[in-house]
Structure formats: structure tokens, C-alpha cells
Amino acid sequence: MNQVWVTGDAVVDLIPESETSLLKCPGGAPANVAVAIARLSGKSAFFGRVGDDPFGRFMQSILDQEGVCTEFLIKDPEQRTSTVVVDLDDQGERSFTFMVKPSADQFMSVEDMGNFKQGDWLHVCSISLANEPSRSSTFEAIKRAKAAGGFISFDPNLRDEVWQDQSEIQAVVMKAVAMADVVKFSEEELLFLTDSTSMAQGLQQIAAMNIALVLVTQGAKGVWRVFESQSELITGQVVSPIDTTGAGDAFVGGLLACLSRHADWKNHPVVSSAIQWANGCGALATTQKGAMTALPTQTELLRFIGQ
């Protein structure tokens, strides 16, 4: 089993509990992925920055409790932990208000990262590419991981409001896409980043980039898989969603927890199994409020997907 390094933002999500109160929940896409992997008995480590404040200490405590390695998590005394108010509609779909700009995660430096080894995975989201110095540090981490013989997983997870210059989004994010071995898009992200008007057009552009595995999630419809020049829509389990916050992160966590178990993962049996894990985790994550609350253990996941 190989280590999965995760970098970016560890966030406190404030989720409506009633008309007059907010529920404090641990979140942030990279942190969610790290916890998802750990719950599935994988090896995950988080590197990056939180504030040396109550929310930062809360996030480190959560990651430690979940079995995520936090040796390289820096508590920055000069910055504040990312805090996001999450608003849910009647269907459990969410919108975000970022309360701290810039937050501590945007100040990650090259000195913060761990030591990558052959076969390790590095998972990155685009928030860490939004501004300097985090952008340069993240691209350096990608280069170091690849040079060590590792693999790169990238989830754009676009949040326009975090970028100081939104005109940079497409070019910067597509640079990261081109460096990745595995990329997970939402349908909206694929269309935006490729300037496409249809899924087919967007997938055609991405296929030309020779990325080993591309996944495009479409919510309840399933996920498009592009692997070895073949594309296929794969459906998953149907649940009644309560809160979709973190569903995409759970999907990625399930995917990487499975892929990281295999030194030779670029084959149909492993990829198919990984997508089954990903779909199961993504579905289960929507069944309770909070991004991490319903992340399954390996036993719970295998029971859910019938293995």
C-alpha cells in the first residue's frame, strides 16, 4: 500500500443547523480526501497550513483522530484558518461564502512539504493554485512527486471567489491537468476549462492530453470514465441525499484508497474496482450533514457496494 499525500486547504465549514445556529464541521476538499482514505484503511498524509487559532487546532485534532499523518501540517501564527459558510437548498445542494481571504493555506511554502517516494500519490485541488506563494509551492510539489516516481491526482474543485485574478483560472488549472495521471472533473468544470459546449467536445479535448485516467462526475447520472482511449458512463448506487457537501471529495478518496493499494494500477480490473469504491463513497457521503460525517469505513463501503 502506497502513501497518499494530500495538500491544500483544511477548512471549518459552518453549516445551518437551524434558523439561528450554525454547525461547526471539519472540511476542505483535500482534508476530506485525506480522511476518506484513512477511514478506508489507506495511508494518507496532509501537508499545508492552517492558522494557529482555535479552528486550526480543531482541524489538526480531527485529522489526528482520523489517522491522517499531520507531521507536515504547519500552524501559521500570522494567518487564519479558512472558514466557509455553507448554504443548503431543499435538494441538499450547496453554495459557499468564504469568510477568510486570504486564508493560511494560501501561504504554503516549499519547505512545508514531505518527502515523496516511488509509488506515492499526491492529490491536489485548484484552491492551492489560486494565489502565490501557494501556487508555486504546489507546482513544485507536483514536480518533486513525479521526479520521485509518484503519481498525481488532480480535482479542479473550482471556487472562483478564492482567486485574486479570475482571468488566470483556465490557464493555471489546465497546466495542472496536463501534469496529472488522474483527473476528476464535474461536468460544469470540464465544459468551462475546455471552452466546450458539450460533454463530447470536452472529452475529446481532454483525451488528446494523454492523461492516464479521466473521470467526469454527473451527480445521480453516474461518472464518465476515459481510460485507454475508451469512454464509458458508469452508474452508481442511488441514495436520498441530505447534504452533498464533500461528495466529490469522498468520491476521490474512495478512488485513491483503492488505486494506492496497487503498484500496477493502470489496468481495467483495478480502475473498475476503484470507480466502484469511488461511487460508493460519494453516495454514502451525502446521507448525513457535514463533509466528513458519513465517510465510510472499508467494512461499511464493501457492505454497501455488495462486496
UniProtKB/Swiss-Prot annotation:
<dbReference type="InterPro" id="IPR011611">
    <property type="entry name" value="PfkB_dom"/>
</dbReference>
<dbReference type="GO" id="GO:0006000">
    <property type="term" value="P:fructose metabolic process"/>
</dbReference>
<dbReference type="InterPro" id="IPR050306">
    <property type="entry name" value="PfkB_Carbo_kinase"/>
</dbReference>
<keyword id="KW-0418">Kinase</keyword>
<dbReference type="InterPro" id="IPR002139">
    <property type="entry name" value="Ribo/fructo_kinase"/>
</dbReference>
<dbReference type="GO" id="GO:0005524">
    <property type="term" value="F:ATP binding"/>
</dbReference>
<keyword id="KW-0547">Nucleotide-binding</keyword>
<dbReference type="GO" id="GO:0008865">
    <property type="term" value="F:fructokinase activity"/>
</dbReference>
<keyword id="KW-0067">ATP-binding</keyword>
<dbReference type="InterPro" id="IPR029056">
    <property type="entry name" value="Ribokinase-like"/>
</dbReference>
<keyword id="KW-0808">Transferase</keyword>
<keyword id="KW-0119">Carbohydrate metabolism</keyword>
<dbReference type="Pfam" id="PF00294">
    <property type="entry name" value="PfkB"/>
</dbReference>
<comment type="similarity">
    <text>Belongs to the carbohydrate kinase PfkB family.</text>
</comment>
<dbReference type="InterPro" id="IPR002173">
    <property type="entry name" value="Carboh/pur_kinase_PfkB_CS"/>
</dbReference>
<protein>
    <recommendedName>
        <fullName>Fructokinase</fullName>
        <ecNumber>2.7.1.4</ecNumber>
    </recommendedName>
</protein>
